[in-house]
C-alpha cells in the first residue's frame, strides 16, 4: 500500500514537471511566433515607406539594414540593394568622394549598409569611405553618436581605428559628463553609446562594464509604466542596446515596469500600417517604423546568439 502511494506521488511529480515544461515551451513558441509576425509586419511597412533603395538616412540606409538583417525572404531584393549602392556612388561622385561633411554618423550608417550588401568599403568607385572614421578629432567633435557608430562600424566591418581606446574613453567621458543616462530628452545618446560599447564590456582596464551598468540603472528609471521609454524610437534603441549585451528585452527584469516589458512598450506605438513615434500621432512615422524593424530584428538575432550590428558568418 505504501509503495503504491509513493509510486503515485512520484508519477504526480513527474506529470507536474512535464506540464510545467510543456507550458514553458508553449510560452516560448508563442513569443517566437509573435516576434516573427511582428517582424514581417514591420518589413511590409518599411517597404511601403521606402520602396526604392537610397542613401537617405531616413527611409534609406536604416531601411536597407533592417530589411537585410530581418531574415524575411525577399525583404531586400537584389534590385533594392543595387539602387542603394548606385545612390551611394552618385553621392560620392557629386561631392568629390565625401558622403556628408557635416554628419559623420550618417556616413558611418551608410558604410554599414554598403558592407552588408557585400561591397568593398575602401573602393566604392575608387573612393575609400572609411577614411573619415579614422580621424578621431573630427569624429569626437561631431558628438557621442559619431563616436558610438565609429566603434560599431569598426567592430562590424574590421575597419581599424588608429587608437581605439581614445574613442572608448571619449564616449564614456561624454555620457558621464552630461549625465545623459538620467535625462529623458538626451537618453538616446546614452542608449546608443551602450550599443557601441557592447563589444568592449569585458574591458575592465577602462571600466566599460561598470559604466554601462550605471547607465542601465539610470535608463531603467526613465522607463514608463507601459514598458516604453517615452517614444517609439527610444524604446527601439533600448531594445537594440539590451540585445547587444545579450539580454532578452521580454524577460530582462531591470526593464519590466508594472508587468510591461520593452517589447510591450514598442508594440504600444504600432498602428494599422506601421509605427508612430509618440502616442499623440496618427500618421505612420518613417523613423519610428524603421527603428521598430531594427529592434524586432535585434530580438530575433539575440535568440540566435547574434547582434544586430555584426556580420553573420
Language-model regions, residue ranges each:
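N-terminal secretory signal peptides that target proteins for export/translocation
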Residues: 1-7
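Preference for long, amphipathic alpha-helical scaffolds in soluble/luminal domains
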Residues: 2, 26-313
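Sec-dependent N-terminal signal peptides of Gram-positive bacterial secreted proteins and lipoproteins
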Residues: 7-28
